[in-house]
Amino acid sequence: EETRKDSLHACSIEDILALLAHIPPQDYADLRLIIFRQPKRKEEILRSAWGRLIYSYEFEGNHEPAIILEAVDYTRQLKWSKHLKPDRQAELERLRADGHQIEEDKRYFTAQYDPRFVRQTQLYRTLPHEIGHYVQYLETVVRPAQPDESSDEWYRRDDAYFAIPTNEKEAFAHRYADRFCEDMKERGLIPFAPLHPTWE
């Protein structure tokens, strides 16, 4: 999607393709869409995210899974309350590890968005994290399918997947992304320089 003047995507298509080349094909199966999206201003305020997995995304009249990567408004700050639950505290530490310069006052953690560090977050964490969600969906719903099973069986597994608590799904996706990135780092494959810098 076309971005607003104050927003841009920190990852290029070339960056995404370079990383995907190292994802096992069976882990993304029929996940063929990666959408570079411009979030609405209200979404940025109320429900900001680096990206997300959409299990059924409408595209050219078809519905199929897609990963959404959100553009970032660089006139805004990353701003979190200091009253963080353990999972949010863990995410704050991940952001620090990505390079984001986190400052704090009595009430908030803040950071200026920097495309170099946004790229680190979206390319090396968000993308494999969302693929991790899809791997869990494949393992729970798709791969157990039998050729002669009824549609009721498929929907039963689908319902079971969406009944998994959010914290369990997040833990699965974090483990997948962490294993993938640790392996890539050990092999010297990441980090790599921007292949087509979007901010220059």
Give the location of each predicted region.
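Long, well-structured alpha-helical subdomains associated
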Residues: 1, 10, 154-200
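A metal-dependent hydrolase signature that marks the N-terminal structural subdomain at the beginning
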Residues: 1-116
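Amphipathic alpha-helical segments that form well-ordered structural scaffolds
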Residues: 15-22, 130, 172-180
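Short, flexible/disordered secondary-structure transition segments
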Residues: 30, 142, 187-191
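Short catalytic/ligand-binding loop motif for oxyanion handling, primarily in non-cytosolic enzymes
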Residues: 76-79, 135, 143-144
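Glycine-rich, phosphate-binding/catalytic loops in enzymes
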Residues: 86, 143-145, 185
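Post-HEXXH active-site segment of zinc metalloproteases
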Residues: 109, 117, 121, 137-177
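Active-site recognition of the HExxH zinc-binding catalytic motif
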Residues: 125-138
